[in-house]
Amino acid sequence: MINVSLKRSLLIFISVITSNIGSEARELTGAGKKLEVATRSSNYAGTARTLLQARPCQRDVDCNFQCPRIQGGQCNNHHGTCDCF
């Protein structure tokens, strides 16, 4: 009986710790705020998609993460988008 209560308390402790780590990570990245702004009103139905999209590029290096690795891409500075090869 003692073994079962110990396992239960350990499981609760681990779940609390991991949930706190997840909430801190969301605060650091700002993901919670982006979703909160997008879901605040029905007038902003398409806002969640645009807020969570990748940031516009500023250099060609930024396009390496958005384009396939082998082909790569080039940053279109005028539009702030990546043109993949």
From Swiss-Prot:
Question: Do the record's keywords include Secreted?
Answer: yes
Q: Which pairs are disulfide-linked? A: C57-C75, C63-C82, C67-C84
Q: Where in the cell is it found?
A: Secreted
Q: Which UniProt keywords apply?
A: Antimicrobial, Disulfide bond, Fungicide, Plant defense, Secreted, Signal
Q: Which Gene Ontology terms of cellular component type are present?
A: extracellular region
Q: Where is the signal peptide?
A: 1-25
**What's a single GO BP term from this record?**
killing of cells of another organism
Please report which protein family the annotation says this sequence is part of.
Belongs to the DEFL family.
This chain's protein is named Putative defensin-like protein 258
